[in-house]
A protein has these predicted regions:
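Protein kinase catalytic-loop region centered on the HRD/HxD motif
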Residues: 193-200
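ATP-binding pocket architecture of kinase catalytic cores
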Residues: 43-137
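Conserved hydrophobic/aromatic beta-strand scaffold that supports enzyme active sites
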Residues: 38-40, 98-100, 201
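ATP-binding glycine-rich phosphate-binding loop
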Residues: 21-40
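ATP/Mg2+ or Mg2+-diphosphate-binding catalytic cores
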Residues: 156-162, 262-292
């Protein structure tokens, strides 16, 4: 996120690091990414994940534990979380969960700089690896009532912030399309469920922003989306990959779109100030709705 969280101080994070990982002398907020907050603390990269709607505290802990298992199994491209002194991977703060990974020496490539052979090799290795015990399975992000509930929510004005009405009217204008997307999504999700025996470990969002090119090769970061799922979940940005099932590719394009719409609806129907993150979120909402 571009803006510092108003609900968590640097001092609180420093105390948590000293208690659960290691003492640090300084900390700096990093205005990177979208959806989570990040800090640099010496050799540590610190993340605050706000749990809902993707996770509970227990499911996030389990997901990061599974990530560590994949790294221990020999997947060198997995940037795994650093365990606490107690062996856990997350620490609750009351406003989310803190986790820590090593601060990597490298950079994320632009979209046109992605080393496709390297990311394809990494994904192939991941998909061939037996899933760790207890790794969560992918589940639909939008249920049968999603479109109708959203239509009802957007039928009355939102007064939650300066961009609330822009978001509401954008969503309301695409109600029929959202219903079509939702119906098709549920049809494809049922098809995927009927093939559960072929599901594999998937990263979920292995796009360029979650790739870091280091002197030792490609590393994949941000594993909170790790789940057992159809392999097509990992190929949204690699559509020409041979052997992909077009229906499963369509499923995960819709999965992304509908989950984004749900999160943006929650975002703008809640109090907000119109800061840089809010502006970026509104642009993202309009893009997902096909409004330019």
């Amino acid at each position: 996120m571009r803006s510092r969280p108003s609900f968590l101080t640097d001092e609180t994070i420093i105390r948590a690091l000293a208690e659960h990982w290691q003492p640090v002398s300084e900390i700096a907020y990093l205005p990177w990414g979208f959806g989570a907050h990040h800090w640099r603390a010496g050799s540590l990269f610190v993340t605050l994940d706000q749990l809902e709607p993707r996770h509970t505290a227990a499911s996030l802990e389990s997901t990061y534990a599974s990530t560590a298992e994949l790294a221990a199994a020999g997947l060198a491209f997995v940037c795994a979380p650093v365990p606490t002194r107690s062996g856990r991977f997350t620490v609750g703060t009351g406003v989310g969960a803190l986790s820590v990974t090593p601060m990597l020496d490298g950079r994320s490539p632009a979209e046109d700089e992605v080393d496709k052979p390297a990311i394809l090799a990494a994904l192939d290795a991941l998909h061939r690896t037996p899933p760790p015990a207890g790794l969560r399975e992918w589940a639909p992000q939008a249920g049968p009532g999603f479109a109708d509930e959203l239509r009802a929510r957007t039928a009355v004005p939102w007064t939650s912030g300066p961009l609330a009405e822009d978001a509401r009217t954008a969503l309301a204008s695409r109600g029929d399309a959202i219903k079509r997307w939702n119906d098709r999504y549920l049809e494809l999700a049922a098809l995927a469920a009927s093939r559960r025996g072929s599901w594999v470990p998937t990263h979920g969002e292995p796009h360029n922003d979650n790739q870091v090119v280091t002197p030792d090769g490609l590393r994949l970061v941000d594993w909170e989306t790790l789940a057992v799922a159809p392999r097509e979940r990992d190929y949204a940005d690699l559509p020409g990959t041979p052997g992909l099932d077009p229906e499963m590719t369509e499923l995960f394009a819709l999965d992304w779109r509908l989950s984004e719409l749900r999160e943006y609806a929650d975002w703008f129907s809640a109090p907000h100030t119109g800061n840089e993150d809010d502006v970026i979120a509104l642009e993202g909402l309009r893009e997902e709705l096909g409004l330019g």
